[in-house]
Amino acid sequence: MAKAKFERTKPHVNIGTIGHVDHGKTTLTAAISRVLSERLPSNTNVKQDFDAIDSAPEERQRGITINISHIEYETEKRHYAHVDAPGHADYIKNMITGAAQMDGAILVVAATDGAMAQTREHVLLAKQVGVPYLLVALNKADMVSDEEILELVELEVRELLSNHGFDGENVPVVRVSGLKALEGDQKWGDAVMELMKAVDESIPDPVRDRDKPFLMPIEDVFTITGRGTVVTGRAERGVLAVNSEVEIVGIRPTQKTTVTGIEMFRKQLDEAWAGENCGLLLRGTKREDVERGQVVVKPGSVTPHTKFEGKAYILSKDEGGRHNPFYSNYRPQFYFRTTDVTGVITLPEGTEMVMPGDTISITVDLIQPIAMEEGLGFAIREGGRTVGAGTVVKILE
């Protein structure tokens, strides 16, 4: 069966839901899907139920559904790909890759609870991984009858956003009830439409880096019987046409191959554009030749490196960081794009130790090469938790 072609008629925006566990991220995602499918019916606005969205991250990862917990929908203005980032601490790694894919995010805060630990953690992570815009869905608003409480929660969330470098004063805060909207309640359906209007208006059309050389970090790799190996990820920049030659850079020696097919939301494309989640079919490449953490690039545009100077912020104990200082030769993991690589930190002369809460210049020696450019962001992690975040300032070798 020939696949339907993906039509590009509206601006495409990647968004997602973030926030504390059980505050209703997935319910709200399902509600957006339902309300839009009823009020703006189209080929794109197909209702996705809660269970399908909720089970996406784990179960379907090994199937051939490209784009794991992404759903697509459209407003009158735009086409959206929406990723539902699960809320548990052990999903933080997914959150880092998921959040890195967002042009903006809906921070879901239950009006019944207010901001909680993971609310703060997700806002901090959103800032670190460069989610440029947030807006707030004050969820479960049907369960709070006291206007003062709603106002207090709103103030608290605005303050939290301001403290983390977002524009807390001007961020839209929309009162919603994902559950009631999902049940078909007219009033709360209107609230979901109001939320989507706020998303349309407060998250600017992303400036896509289409003119730069193509780069896509690999998130997943699988085999499609009879066709070959597919790598999936979000194109960070550039445009890639079918039958183009590419290089796969990082972790292993650089290899050349040809992209023989491109698909997105199970539809065939002639080209992959910056900002799109897609799967690339690679000619003559075996499943074991490529892995998560490598990047697919225009030949000659990016090189692998192991040693760099970076600027990093080390999280304080209160932010969930380390409780004690570290010294030269500290060996954490450096999380670049989609993978962790161990690296050895050397502190600048005259700096004996680094305290939680410090901002510091470091030299890092990675045990495996990573496709790297100046300005590339990374997280510093240890034992599965983020203890710092930084940027590559200068490549040394």
Curated annotation (Swiss-Prot):
Residues 19-26 are annotated as: G1. Pfam families: GTP_EFTU, GTP_EFTU_D2, GTP_EFTU_D3. Disulfide bonds: none annotated. Residues 84-87 are annotated as: G3. GTP binds at residues 19-26, 84-88, 139-142. GTP hydrolase that promotes the GTP-dependent binding of aminoacyl-tRNA to the A-site of ribosomes during protein biosynthesis. PROSITE patterns: G_TR_1, G_TR_2. Residues 63-67 are annotated as: G2. Mg(2+) binds at T26. It catalyses: GTP + H2O = GDP + phosphate + H(+). Its EC number is 3.6.5.3. Monomer. Residues 177-179 are annotated as: G5. Residues 10-207 form the tr-type G domain. This is Elongation factor Tu. It comes from Tropheryma whipplei (strain Twist). Belongs to the TRAFAC class translation factor GTPase superfamily. Classic translation factor GTPase family. EF-Tu/EF-1A subfamily. It is found in: Cytoplasm. It is an enzyme of class 3 (hydrolase). One of its GO terms (molecular function) is translation elongation factor activity. Residues 139-142 are annotated as: G4. Transmembrane segments: none annotated. It comes from the Bacteria.
